[in-house]
Amino acid sequence: MSEWNEYKLSEITTKVGSGATPRGGQESYKYDGISLIRSQNVLDFEFSGSGLAFIDNEQASQLSNVKVVEDDILLNITGDSVARVCKVPKSILPARVNQHVSIVRANLTEVIPDYLLYYLLNPQFKKYMLMIASDGATRNALTKAEIEDFDIWVPSISEQKAIA
């Protein structure tokens, strides 16, 4: 068995961040275009296309800092669906996230996305995220700083592949 090392999530990712709702809110959504991922789309282990919103190229360019790429992990960070986690499906790309969803992008030299997905969805870790999200708040929420501060135990890449 290989050695496991403890890292802060920020040390094994290249991006943690959430987006915004385009100016004009729901009225500005389009019938097709660039996918805008909202919290209702993120279920545990599963992405739901139900109610997927779309924005145009101009709106997407205003959200270029939250461009979703293949293998990104999506984490709901507010409300009753806080701490739900899934991997983005390739079929909905190109995409952006709104302010209720955070992108967690694995640093592939440190951790594989599927291992990170399973780690975040482990029942004990899920319970931990829910505890943090409800701590002293009137609304469940996880901040970027809290997410980046998550302690993640990581084995070798080969062992991660065996686990995932």
Descriptions of predicted regions:
Residues 1-20, 149-164:
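Non-catalytic DNA-recognition/assembly elements of restriction-modification systems
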Residues 3-6, 30-33, 49:
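A short, polar/charged loop/turn motif at coil->beta-strand junctions and beta-hairpin connectors
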Residues 10-26, 41-70:
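Sequence-specific dsDNA recognition surfaces
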Residues 26-27, 92, 138-141:
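Short proline/glycine-enriched turn/loop segments at secondary-structure junctions
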Residues 29-30, 95:
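Extracellular/periplasmic catalytic domains that process cell-envelope and extracellular macromolecules
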Residues 33, 51, 98-100:
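A generic structural signal for short beta-strands and their flanking turns/coil linkers
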Residues 38, 57-121, 143:
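A short beta-sheet element
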Residues 39-40, 78, 97-101, 117-157:
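Glycine-anchored helix-breaking recognition loops at helix->coil/strand junctions
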